[in-house]
Amino acid sequence: MNASLYQQYVQAKAEHPGKYARDLATLMGISEAELTHSRVGHDAKRLQSDARALLAALESVGEVKAITRNTYAVHEQVGRYENQHLNGHAGLILNPRALDLRLFLNQWASAFTLTEETRHGVRHSIQFFDHQGDALHKVYVTEQTDMSAWEALLAQFIIPENPALQLEPLSTPEAVEPTADDATVDSEWRAMTDVHQFFQLLKRNNLTRQQAFRAVGDDLAYQVDNNSLTQLLHIAQQDQNEIMIFVGNRGCVQIFTGLIEKVTPHNEWINVFNQRFTLHLIETAIAESWITRKPTKDGFVTSLELFAADGTQLAQLYGQRTEGQPEQNQWREQIARLINKDIAA
């Protein structure tokens, strides 16, 4: 099976030389993990699936490029796997303004290392996949990576066999009616003292994020035009205040904090090119753009949240804020410049 899959991959790659493995897998009707599994013995090797141990070992290799993506957005950050807190099912790699990750490790299922020949030379990577076979997180060598430490890590974690992937269909919970009326949701939202309490509010009331947004008053959540992301990135680039950009998937959220250096649209993509950070996001996939205001003990925190038609959250943007400090007035003024969407239209 793997041999024929690999041959299909080689053929698909020859027919579509510019496409990434994720897109080739989609063309082939398989997951990216299945595609990578078929490459073992060619340009891939299987690694032990202990994500915590692998992530901990990555601290030794120094600088790398970390990539976290979903279907519509790709977040690339150069940094180091330092300041790790990987206890329990959730983990943190906490380096604000550098490599800043939130990890949901019960979603991490398999790992591979790849050595790929590309038109830009050889690329070395470690790639992590979830139980559905989707890529959660990828780690690429840079010119500054300690290659002797990288090779030592691989020697420790490569396994000679390539066990079958135990893929599971994504369990989509049946549609459940919200358990609270709009007034209750609004009241509970206003009572929050920490943005992380929002997840508890959603769970308690069987709500999606967008259902909660629609339930509360316009002073807490309202829709804006879907070109708001591009507008806000250009404003932040012009004003040179620090912002935060969150992009995530089921198992990993990657966070950028800093100044925006260059914003470049290209076809359907909006791109941010910084020296150590890159964002690629399919602007045409944005179906809803929401401004939300969540109360904390330090005052309200305002964000722009972007959703695709299938409900996927593409990205979230905040003004840079340190715990214990109020939100930037400049960020609030920038948000206020975005155009309200007339929902009734």
Curated annotation (Swiss-Prot):
Keywords (A to Z) from UniProt: Ion transport, Iron, Iron transport, Transport
Function: Part of the binding-protein-dependent transport system for hemin.
Pfam families: HemS
Organism of provenance: Yersinia pestis
Protein name according to UniProt: Hemin transport protein HmuS
Similarity comment: family membership: To Y.enterocolitica HemS.
Gene3D superfamilies: HemS/ChuS/ChuX like domains
GO BP term (any one): iron ion transport
